[in-house]
Every structure is written in C-alpha cells, then in structure tokens.
C-alpha cells in the first residue's frame, strides 16, 4: 500500500495522508457476505453511554469474515482484495472449489489468483490455516485462536504478526505483536503470514472532520469543564486539578492505574507480559 501526501492548501490538508489503495482490486463487495450494521454510539441496552467518544460516522455494512478457517481440504482461490470499513486490515474474497464464497483477513503478499487451503495437511504457505501443532517453530502467523474451534481472536489488525517460538507439552509458545509471550493450546488454529496493509500505522488523520467520518467524537479534557461535569473542572483560568492524582469523570483513579484483574484466569498462560 502506498501513501498519498497533499500540498498544504489548507490546515487540514497540511499533515493529512491517505492510502493509495493499490492492493484493492474491486470496490463492490460480495452481497451474500454483507450484513446490516446499526450504530450504537457507545450506548448500552439502557441507552446510557458506556463508551465515550463514539457516534456518527459514515454508514457501513458488516462484512462476514471467516475467522474459523474450518473448510478443511477444499482449495480456495483468491478472487479479490477488498477494503473493509470495519477494520484496519484488508480482506480477501475466496472462491472455494465447491462453489462457496468466504472473506478472510488478507495476509501480506497474498495476490489475486493465489490458492489457499485449511486443515492439518495444508502446506506452510501464506494464507493457509493449520492447527499450531502442525506449524514449524519460527513461523510467522496471525489470526490465532485462543479456544479450539472458536475462531481467530489474536493478531488480526493491519501489519501485525506473531511468531511461534516453541512447544511445551500440549501447548505452543507464541510471541505476540505486543511483545507478550504466552502458551496457547496446540490444537488451536492460526494462519500463516503477516496481516497485510502494513502502512496503515503511517496514516495521518489530518483534521477533526476525518475523525468524525470514522465515528470518533471529540475527547474533551476534564480541566476545561465545569466542576459539576468533572472533578478536574472549575477554578480561575488554567487551574491545577487540585488532587494528588488524576481521576475519571466519576472520581476513580486513572492515568497509570492498573486495571487488569489481580486473579485473571489467563495469567497461568502468560510467560512474559507485554511491553509497557
């Protein structure tokens, strides 16, 4: 993927960068793999905001992605590489030999016309999905399952990858893109290769309006609010927060406070925590 820069014809254009979408081969998605997607705007079933800074944005259709990769032994051919507004990675439309069509996360260097396959007997080739007990040590992988048959949950964002470091009984040891090293059951599946769209992290939003197109609302500092809106608010001019440590709008400590559970069940599988 290339990155397009603009002449500074306005303050919004000055820093803005956009993708050239060179890898995208079609702008029309497969209708049978689309689903309606209603906007939640950060609200729960009571209508209360549970996630701030969400709302608005362009209307989207959800693309049904095959994270399970459980169509074993049937060869699929890459028909298109497409843009997906719901994720940072691109997606690939796969036409299988039995006539079924599925979307998958598009790995780096996967091209139209390439053949992929899933299952324990699949070759170690970009886009193929196998149980991790069949993947050689040192292989770069993505779309990793945490529970057998549940579908890939880890390493799905653009440009990310993990590495299979070794084996430990019925587990494999995997180093994730965050730097965390953890054990995962060796029956769980993973896809060979790195997630595509590597330049996504280099994009610059450039202006506030483009964030609004993405459904991201402004983040307002508590110190510029009134005291009835935030514990940091009020005072004359640029007043300090008047507390030992910063807090959330609801008075709970934040900015540096650890929020992970003390007795998280997954602690037993983590060998080395992620990089800070």
UniProtKB/Swiss-Prot annotation:
Record family assignment: Belongs to the universal ribosomal protein uL2 family.
Function (record text): One of the primary rRNA binding proteins. Required for association of the 30S and 50S subunits to form the 70S ribosome, for tRNA binding and peptide bond formation. It has been suggested to have peptidyltransferase activity; this is somewhat controversial. Makes several contacts with the 16S rRNA in the 70S ribosome.
Gene: rplB
One record GO biological process: cytoplasmic translation
Positions of region (Disordered): 221-276
Oligomer and partners: Part of the 50S ribosomal subunit. Forms a bridge to the 30S subunit in the 70S ribosome.
Any one Gene Ontology cellular component term annotated for this protein: large ribosomal subunit
PROSITE patterns xrefs: RIBOSOMAL_L2
Protein species of origin: Brevibacillus brevis (strain 47 / JCM 6285 / NBRC 100599)
Residue stretches in coiled coil: none
Keywords carried by this UniProt record: Ribonucleoprotein, Ribosomal protein, RNA-binding, rRNA-binding
Alphabetized Pfam families for the sequence: Ribosomal_L2 (PF00181), Ribosomal_L2_C (PF03947)
Name used for this protein in its record: Large ribosomal subunit protein uL2
